[in-house]
Amino acid sequence: MKEIAKRDKAKVIPTGATAANRLGFSTQVPMNTIFLTTGSGRKMKLGNRTVTLKHGAPKNFAFRGRLMPELVQALRNIGEHNITQDVEARIGQLFTETPETDTIEYDLLLAPVWMRQVIKKGIKQ
């Protein structure tokens, strides 16, 4: 995906189950991978997997940090009512591994309110 994004001069972020898997919230690897892009949408076959690029809204790419856009997509996939203590602990772990202290405040304002609360709770743990 990085090569395609570089070639097209577009930003690309994983959505849904792909983001959840990449961040360690899920062990399931989706067969049909969907990415949001600032470029044009299309479908590609890579081996036995289908990769779909969908043109995303600018708000999905407004984040300054590298972790937050993917985290927002993963939490959207998990759902507000399915957040567990394990998810909150993993969020804290992610921010320990990838500290984004200079962008976190700005990025939190862009996230939906329920996600903001979950992320803040996870960071405090």
What are these regions (language model features)?
Residues 1-3:
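HTH-adjacent hinge/linker in prokaryotic transcriptional regulators
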Residues 5-46:
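Short gly/ser-rich loop at a beta-strand->alpha-helix junction or flexible surface loop bordering the NTP-binding
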Residues 34-35, 52, 70:
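Generic structural signal for residues positioned in beta-strands
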Residues 45-55:
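A short, charged helix-loop
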Residues 55-125:
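Hydrophobic alpha-helical interaction segments
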